[in-house]
């Protein structure tokens, strides 16, 4: 079983079409990985699907980096 961090990074690579080595925990979706607003919405939807959870819009707006996505999933998803 992959770790949450590995699963989140895999989703980011697939959704944003970036290289795996570019997806560091400190990477910002917009500033570092070139995501636009539609990309970030699709990314949140992919996270919801992967981790079988719902991320409210007000929470989704706060998830702007890889680490924030990992932290959110760890805090809100039962493993």
From Swiss-Prot:
Cellular component GO terms, alphabetical: cytosol; membrane
Subcellular localization: Cytoplasm
Molecular function terms from GO: acyl binding; acyl carrier activity
One of the Pfam families matching this protein, by short name: PP-binding
Keywords of this entry: Cytoplasm, Fatty acid biosynthesis, Fatty acid metabolism, Lipid biosynthesis, Lipid metabolism, Phosphopantetheine, Phosphoprotein
GO biological process: one example: lipid A biosynthetic process
Modified residues (O-(pantetheine 4'-phosphoryl)serine): 37
SUPFAM superfamilies found in the cross-reference section: ACP-like
PTM section of the record: 4'-phosphopantetheine is transferred from CoA to a specific serine of apo-ACP by AcpS. This modification is essential for activity because fatty acids are bound in thioester linkage to the sulfhydryl of the prosthetic group.
Domain Carrier: 2-77
Intrachain disulfide bonds: none
UniProt xrefs under InterPro entries: ACP, ACP-like_sf, PP-bd_ACP, Ppantetheine_attach_site
The family this protein is said to belong to: Belongs to the acyl carrier protein (ACP) family.
PANTHER family registered for this protein in UniProt: ACYL CARRIER PROTEIN, CARRIER DOMAIN-CONTAINING PROTEIN
Function (record text): Carrier of the growing fatty acid chain in fatty acid biosynthesis.
Protein known as: Acyl carrier protein
Species in which this protein is naturally found: Xanthomonas campestris pv. campestris (strain ATCC 33913 / DSM 3586 / NCPPB 528 / LMG 568 / P 25)
The gene coding this protein: acpP
């Amino acid at each position: 079983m992959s770790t949450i961090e590995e699963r989140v990074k895999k989703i980011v690579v697939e959704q944003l079409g970036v290289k795996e080595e570019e997806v560091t925990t400190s990477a910002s979706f917009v500033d570092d990985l070139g995501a636009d607003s539609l990309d970030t919405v699709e990314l949140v939807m992919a996270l919801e699907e992967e981790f079988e959870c719902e991320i409210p819009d007000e929470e989704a707006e706060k998830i702007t980096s890889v680490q924030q996505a990992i932290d959110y999933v760890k805090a809100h998803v039962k493993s």
